[in-house]
From Swiss-Prot:
The keyword Kinase belongs to this UniProt entry's keyword annotation: no
Entry keywords, A to Z: Chloroplast, DNA-directed RNA polymerase, Metal-binding, Nucleotidyltransferase, Plastid, Transcription, Transferase, Zinc
Name of this protein: DNA-directed RNA polymerase subunit beta''
Superkingdom classification of source: Eukaryota
EC number assigned by the record: 2.7.7.6
Residues that coordinate or bind Zn(2+): C220, C293, C300, C303
UniProt keyword Chloroplast present: yes
Length: 1383
């Protein structure tokens, strides 16, 4: 009774883990037999209690966790805040996705952790609780889906779906949640069907490669060992893995703590000894593994260690190879049957947080941290070393140490509340998570114009690419605007920066335009379909538009006008000017240049004598097809073009032009295809084809006719000649000639067809063979050159009534020589004739000594209409601005008397109108196809006004100057202080000025543009002809980027030399919800377009955040459409790590065929090592050391990679099983060609130990290199051909063995099973064994510490010591590398 009183009574619920510990203790204390007796009693007790209680499971037993409601609500609130931050441009899409997933993952995890305590408190005998937590059926994850929430799912590609399933199976799923959860179910069904066979085949191959490994000895006598240490310089090995690694192993060396020996060599390690090592903090423990065993075809007891079935050393005769193969293959088979509903993306859990213990103020050393962004886009401080953070409250000071590489989420001197997160500790580096680099494409939500800051590289990543790198965090902005198709605009009179009344954003456009050429008359047809059946209010009638387009009295000019300060212009931006023409009725007999005049002003604005001032191309002389130009007997003299001619439309400069002397030339059309040499041509030479015949795989013919194929250097030229084929008689003399033109009216007198030729024809003789020939009659297009143009129709009279000292001469050029072929590039048309206006001036003039003339603009204001004229004079002038033009307020058809060259209208009422319903300013671009494209901006749909700001006060001097100075008064009346500043569009800020003189000063380089200071030193001419003298105060310098005022008058120079900062600057960007006025935050993000005295107008813009390393698609100022790729983010994500995706990885590693499994770094190092060590040590030593080094490194890498996959699934496989497999696939070497030996052939595979022993026996060096065999190749390269033949390729293996006369010694298990004999394992392992030499007993063992890290920590230098080099093995210096993958 006394003894019983001392017994401790435990009244606790016992779970699976506690039972395991109890059994382990019982075995240690009482042994196996007594323990089994105790466990029988426990089992009987359990059955009796289960029968008595009769537990059943019903749907009411599934109790939802009460805290679920507010946890989900809290997660939704965080997601809403995150969505707002993303909308404001504070976080980008990847950060948003990452944080959203972590928010819901953390919520799901909290619910899962709440589940067990909730059951324990509310209903400890709940059947669901008892079943799931006893391990009888179901696990915590499955029960969590029943009573918690299903959480996040992965799609079939393994990517995370952003939408979590908030319901559990007890509450029921919505339709959306059901469809999302079906992804996981389908994946599970497919995995069960498909992957199980893969896992089974993997098991078969694994068993095949190691079936002959049996424990044959107690001790092989090795002195090598592998060092395992719990802690290193870089990383900690977790304690459970350290214990699992050591338990059951045998020590390779004595262990000393101080001077006391606590464990001996060849002693097996139990849990007690391992715990003692951990307690005493032993630095490194040297253990024996299958890698260190000195045999190839068997293994000794000490190198294998304890048997997993009973806690003692493995018995002799144990078939440990088959056990190893089954241990690795079987978990894969089991795990494929398990369905993974959650996708298992976050296998490692969330990061650890440091929380404040109570309220107080934070203090830390700011020099030890630097600002950064967390992976969720939050601002934080990163500390590189241990950082001490002090929390001061009223009565206590608490210090917290933050480990290195952690994020500090609070600022210095910030007040924190109790339990507030102050730091985030990075996850432990020892994780088994798969990381993969993923590209995330961000697409544009709306159409508009791209804008970025100087933080993006303006030069693209590669030449001719449109990808730009982001070196630091910055915003991309899409400035809103509605695109207008060029088909509708191209016949209207609207140009860049015009105001428009047509509502392009309201209706869809459908327009068909066609040009028909009838003789000399050019008629234009414009067909406009009904734009919309329902006419909405505010949409004007389209008769006004048709009036503009149909009665096209005016001609469009697409001129490239370059200014003196051309560095301010974007290369792709061109300003458009308008030149009026008389109506068609007035010039019925006149030449009407429909395609428009292009005025070519040189870059510097200087014309030389006889230089081309303008040119235009008549569409009548334009051909779509290729062909040959013929003048007949017409002579032509070539005119060399001036070198300073501007390139027109990006076409290369013409070397020569041909001036026509008579008025007719001919064009003979033909279809030409130039094909690469390797093309497959599907038609024969000199064959006749129809229209739309397939010529090659991708090309069909446009015309029918005769095929002619010419093979030239590296290309094939295929021509199709349309026309008639004639076989001439002897009487047809005219057809015996080749290459002649026949005028109309000449018939064929003696042929069957007596019809005369209606048009010109071209006769060409074709000779397929020497004897045969025929004649091809081809149609000819005849062109007449029109008379010279009346210059009065092009340019009005001299309005300034100056002396006419500059003449314009009309010259027609033919752009191709006689007989030269014309070739069209893709679908472009070919211009045959160009009419040019050549500048010349009177030689009798006094200024004739001047060899150059300058072009400049003159602007005159009358009745609110500003008229711009271009003057070409022999005086020096400047071209230094681009004019802002808008339509008049009553914009419709502009009457002829208002049409002056280069008109421009004061935007006095234009800006106010532009914000009404259907007004807008258009901007002109060249799109990706180099076509003109318009963007509608400054309309009510994409702009908004902020203000008025009542609290804005201007300086008194400005107010006084406004009173005194009429100039600023006019400017105030004209509406805005400024308009938008884009790339190269610098507008005049004072719209009613005639600019006689203007100086441009380079002020500051910003954003790849020049900031401009405009010094306004000019006179104002009003419509009454009065000239307002400028006031001293009017020397105002305007900085368009900041709208600050400078006064240059001497009285104010000392007071106002500095900038006076204002609240809002022009062109500035505002994010949404930003406070810029006292009234509160404004609601939209945008760019400041107009600044007025009391309000601002913003153009809507959408911000996108880009972090370093992102790639921006598209160029600055380019139009983007909805759905275009905007940014590519490259980031690392955790791959879904279930075993079905891990198994192929295990197979890749074991079959040594994965591409990325040898890191290039290691491969280069090993190659370098082999190369240089051979030079240092000589041929034999270098090869042996290099091979041993490579084998050791690859073995360690392979073990780590395989363990990563299984540990990520929570599957524990002992390292020794993997080591046995890996030892077999790394035990062979490849005989190399250097130093030919008489024993082995180059390229032969032999075992490493065999190579060493043969070298010692023959006393000559055998050169070899390490090689990694896959498990399949290793199975086919064994000592037994019977085993190989029974695996695969039976006929080949047996035939080869017969030819070579191989002998099978029947050492393995499989060959004995095949032949029906007893297997050499278990009790029969002693039968028929060939005893190996006992050479190892003579070796003097030198005990040294060998350090080789098998696991994730650093590997150190290894020294293998032997007495002599050729006696046993080589003493090698092995440098090991970390973080490599082997293939």
């Amino acid at each position: 009774m006394g003894e019983r009183a001392n017994l401790v009574f435990h009244n606790k619920i016992i779970d699976g883990t506690a039972i395991k510990r109890l059994i382990s203790r019982l075995i240690d204390h009482f042994g196996m037999a007594y323990t089994s007796h105790i466990l029988d009693q426990v089992k009987t007790l359990g059955f009796q209690q289960a029968t008595a209680t009769s537990i059943s499971l019903g749907i009411d037993d599934l109790l939802t966790i009460p805290s679920k409601g507010w946890l989900v609500q809290d997660a939704e609130q965080q997601s809403l805040i995150l969505e707002k931050h993303h909308h404001y441009g504070n976080v980008h899409a990847v950060e948003k996705l990452r944080q959203s997933i972590e928010i819901w993952y953390a919520t799901s995890e909290y619910l899962r952790q709440e589940m067990n305590p909730n059951f324990r408190m509310t209903d400890p005998f709940n059947p669901v609780h008892m079943m799931s937590f006893s391990g009888a059926r179901g696990n915590a994850s499955q029960v969590h889906q029943l009573v918690g929430m299903r959480g996040l799912m992965s799609d079939p590609q393994g990517q995370m779906i952003d939408l979590p399933i908030q319901s559990n199976l007890r509450e029921g799923l919505s339709l959306t949640e059901y469809i999302i959860s079906c992804y996981g179910a389908r994946k599970g069904v497919v995995d069960t069907a498909v992957r199980t066979s893969d896992a089974g085949y993997l098991t078969r191959r694994l068993v095949e490669v190691v079936q002959h490994i049996v424990v044959r000895r107690t001790d092989c006598g090795t002195i090598r060992g592998i060092s395992v240490s719990p802690r290193n310089k870089n990383r900690m090995m977790s304690e459970p893995i350290f214990i699992q690694t050591l338990i059951g192993r045998v020590l390779a060396d004595d262990i000393y703590i101080g001077s006391r020996c606590v464990a001996f060599r060849n002693q097996d390690l139990g849990i007690g000894l391992v715990n003692r090592f951990i307690t005493f903090g032993t630095q490194s423990i040297s253990i024996r593994t299958p890698f260190t065993c000195r045999s190839t075809s068997w293994i000794c007891r000490f190198c294998y260690g304890r048997s997993p079935t009973h806690g003692d050393l493995v018995e002799l005769g144990e078939a440990v190879g088959i056990i190893a193969g089954q241990s690795i293959g079987e978990p894969g088979t089991q795990l494929t049957l398990r369905t993974f509903h959650t996708g298992g993306v976050f296998t490692g859990g969330t990061a650890e947080h440091v929380r404040a213990p109570y309220n107080g103020k934070i203090k830390f050393n700011e020099d030890l941290v630097h600002p950064t962004r967390t992976r969720h886009g939050h601002p934080a401080f990163l500390c590189y070393i241990d950082l001490s953070v002090i929390i001061e409250s009223e009565d206590i000071i608490h210090s917290v140490t933050i480990p290195p590489k952690s994020f500090l989420l609070v600022q210095n001197d910030q007040y924190v509340e109790s339990e507030q997160v102050i730091a985030e500790i990075r996850e432990g580096t020892y994780t088994f998570r798969f990381k993969e680099r993923v590209r995330k494409y961000i697409y544009s939500d709306s159409e508009g114009e791209m804008h970025w800051s100087t933080d993006v590289y303006h030069a693209p990543e590669f030449t001719y690419s449109n990808v730009h790198l982001v070196p630091k965090t910055s915003h991309l902005w899409i400035l809103s605007g509605g695109s207008c198709g060029s088909s509708l605009i191209s016949f209207s009179i609207h140009k860049d920066q015009d105001q428009m009344n047509i509502p392009f954003l309201s209706v869809k456009r459908k327009s068909i335009c066609s040009l028909s050429v009838n003789n000399d008359q050019v008629s234009q047809k414009f067909l406009s379909s009904d734009f919309s059946d329902k006419k909405k209010s505010g949409i004007p009638d389209y008769s006004e538009l048709n009036g503009i387009v149909g009665n096209s009295h005016y001609n469009l000019i697409y001129s490239a006008i370059f200014h003196e300060n051309s560095d301010l212009l974007a290369k792709r931006r061109r300003n458009r000017f308008l030149i009026p023409f008389q109506s068609i009725q007035e010039q019925e007999k006149e030449f009407m240049p429909h395609s428009g005049i292009s005025i070519a002003i040189p870059i510097n604005g200087i014309f030389r004598k006889n230089s081309i001032f303008s040119f235009f191309d008549d569409p009548r002389y334009r051909r779509k097809s290729s062909g040959i130009l013929k003048y007949g007997t017409i002579e032509a003299d070539s005119i060399i073009q001036k070198e300073d001619m501007i390139e027109y439309r990006g076409v290369h400069k013409f070397k020569k032009k041909y001036k026509m002397k008579v008025d007719r030339f001919f064009f003979i059309p033909e279809e030409v295809h130039i094909l690469p040499e390797s093309s497959v041509i599907m038609v024969q030479n000199y064959s006749i084809i129809r229209v739309d015949t397939r010529i090659t795989l991708n090309i069909r013919s446009q015309v029918g006719g005769l095929i002619r194929v010419e093979r030239k250097k590296k290309r094939i030229e295929l021509k199709i000649f349309s026309g008639d084929i004639h076989f001439p008689d002897k009487t047809d003399k005219i057809f015996r000639h080749s290459g002649i033109l026949i005028p109309p009216g000449r018939g064929k007198p003696n042929s069957r067809e007596s019809k005369k030729v209606q048009n010109w024809i071209y006769v060409q003789r074709i000779t397929p063979t020497k004897k045969k020939f025929f004649v091809l009659v081809r149609p000819v297009a005849t062109y007449e050159i029109a008379d010279s143009i009346n210059l009065a129709t092009l340019f009005p009279q001299d309005l300034f009534r100056e002396k006419n000292n500059i003449q314009l001469r009309v010259v027609n050029y033919i752009l191709y020589g006689n007989g030269n072929p014309t070739r069209g590039i893709s679908d472009t048309s070919i211009q045959l004739v160009r009419t040019c206006l050549v500048l010349n001036w009177d030689q009798d003039n006094k200024k004739s000594s001047l060899e150059e003339a300058r072009a400049f603009f003159v602007a005159v204001s009358t009745k609110g209409l500003i008229r711009d004229f271009i003057r070409i004079g022999l005086v020096k002038s400047h071209i230094s601005y681009i004019r802002k033009r808008t339509n008049p307020p009553d914009s419709g058809l502009i009457s002829a008397d208002h049409m002056n060259p280069f008109y421009s209208i004061s935007p006095k009422a234009g800006i106010q109108q532009s914000l009404s319903q259907n007004n807008g300013t258009i901007r002109m671009f060249l799109n990706r196809n180099k076509e003109s494209q318009f963007l509608l901006i400054l309309s009510s749909s994409n702009c908004f006004r902020m203000g008025p700001f009542n609290h804005v006060k201007y300086h008194n001097v400005i107010n006084q100057s406004i009173k005194k100075n009429p100039l600023i008064t006019i400017q105030k009346a004209s509406g805005p202080l400024g308009t938008t500043i884009q790339i190269s569009n610098f507008y005049s800020f004072f719209p009613l000025l005639t600019y006689n003189k203007m100086s441009v000063i380079k002020y500051l380089q910003l954003d790849n543009l020049k900031q401009i200071l405009k010094v306004i030193n000019s006179y104002l001419i009003d419509e009454n002809g009065r000239i307002c003298n400028r006031d001293p105060y009017s020397n105002v310098v305007l900085n368009p980027f900041k709208l600050n005022w400078y006064f240059l008058h001497q009285n104010y120079h000392h007071n106002y030399c500095e900038e006076i900062s204002t609240i809002i600057s022009l062109g500035q960007f505002f994010c949404e919800n930003l406070c810029i006025a006292k009234k509160g935050p404004h609601l939209k993000s945008g760019q400041v377009l107009i600044v007025q005295m009391d309000s601002v107008v913003l153009r809507c813009a959408k911000p996108y955040l880009a972090t370093p390393g992102a790639k921006v698609h598209g160029h600055y100022g380019e139009i983007l459409y909805e759905g275009d790729t905007l940014v590519t983010f490259i980031y690392e994500k955790s791959r879904s790590g279930d075993i079905t995706q891990g198994l192929p990885k295990v197979e890749q590693v074991l079959e040594v065929r994965s591409i990325d499994s040898i890191s290039m770094n290691l491969e280069k190092r090993i190659k370098g090592w082999n190369k240089y060590i051979t030079r240092i040590l000589g041929i034999p030593w270098g090869f042996l050391v290099g091979a041993e080094l490579t084998i050791v490194q690859s073995r360690i890498s392979l073990v780590n990679k395989i363990q990563k996959v299984y540990r990520s699934q929570g599957v524990q496989i002992h390292n020794r099983h993997i080591e046995i497999i890996v030892r077999q696939i790394t035990s062979k070497v490849l005989v190399s060609e250097e130093g030919m030996s008489n024993v082995f052939l180059p390229g032969e595979l032999i075992g490493l130990l065999r190579a060493e022993r043969t070298g010692r026996a023959l006393e000559e060096a055998i050169c070899y290199r390490a090689i990694l065999l896959g498990i399949t190749r290793a199975s086919l390269n064994t000592q037994s051909f019977i085993s190989e033949a029974s695996f695969q390729e039976t006929a080949r293996v047996l035939a080869k063995a017969a030819l070579r006369g191989r002998i099978d010694w029947l050492k393995g298990l499989k060959e004995n099973v095949v032949l029906g004999g007893g297997i050499p394992a278990g009790t029969g392992f002693n039968k028929g064994l060939v005893h190996c030499s006992r050479q190892h007993t003579n070796i003097l063992l030198e005990k040294k510490t060998k350090n080789l890290c098998l696991f994730e920590e650093d590997m150190r230098d290894i020294l293998f010591y032997h007495r002599e080099f050729f006696d046993s093995s080589i003493s090698k210096l092995e440098r090991s590398f970390l973080g490599f993958n082997y293939s």
